Amino acid sequence: MKVTVIGCYGGFPAANEATSGYLFQSGDYSLLVDCGSAVLSKLFGYVPAEKLDAVVLSHYHHDHIADIGPLQFAKQVGSFLGKGEHTLPIYGHDADIEQFQKLTYKTHTKGIAYQPDQPLTAGPFTITFLKTIHPVTCYAMRITDGSHTVVYTADSSYQDSFIPFSKDADLLISECNFYADQDGTSAGHMNSLEAGRIAKEAGAGELLLTHLPHFGVHDNLRKEAKTVFNGEVNIAKSGFVWEG
């Protein structure tokens, strides 16, 4: 399994960066997890629209879905140019039916509702879900290709259920919108110590901090998480690659 960070900022993209987007690849299958602002401009450096096999969305905040519309247009233009005719499945929850319905665009993309209490199969990947604590309905994901497992917290304040959900994951991709001396609970986000605690208590192999803030020194997030978790800790950035 190969995971490439496409975008990692919370809220809005920093200059020459993107918000949430993660490319999961196994064999010749490419799965995009979340599709935030400026993600496409980065994604197309790795895989063109016609080679993308599926998209799965954690929730419908702009910084996780802003480039869905442009992706739909990319598929449409590609079909005009004869670059593949397959309909791109976009998986999302249907708790917000208005947003879910926007995932289907003509014959180019089709919104498919995942059932949070059931595993989702997308090519070689099996995805299970955990509801998070966030102002809108949002789901964390545990993604495995049968050999390796990656857990993505999506957006959430801390909850104990992340620990069994993340148990023995090879990589934990945890949101980290706040520093150790800050409390992100009311905003539905976590700080560095909380991310480190989940990684430690779940027995994760590595920790990748993402959904980064637009203030402070990001390496301090890593240092703070390291005071709790003894494993490898990295700060996400566009182009970061993890291979299991």
From Swiss-Prot:
Keyword Hydrolase: yes
Keywords: Hydrolase, Metal-binding, Zinc
Primary enzyme class: hydrolase
Record organism: Bacillus subtilis (strain 168)
Co-factor(s): Zn(2+)
Annotated Zn(2+) 2 binding sites: D63, H64, D155, H211
InterPro entries listed in its UniProt record: Metallo-B-lactamas (IPR001279), RibonucZ/Hydroxyglut_hydro (IPR036866)
Stated family: Belongs to the metallo-beta-lactamase superfamily.
Binding site for Zn(2+) 1: H59, H61, H134, D155
Note on cofactor: Binds 2 Zn(2+) ions per subunit.
Protein name in the entry: Probable metallo-hydrolase YhfI
Any one GO molecular function term: 3'-tRNA processing endoribonuclease activity
Keyword Metal-binding: yes
Listed EC numbers: 3.-.-.-
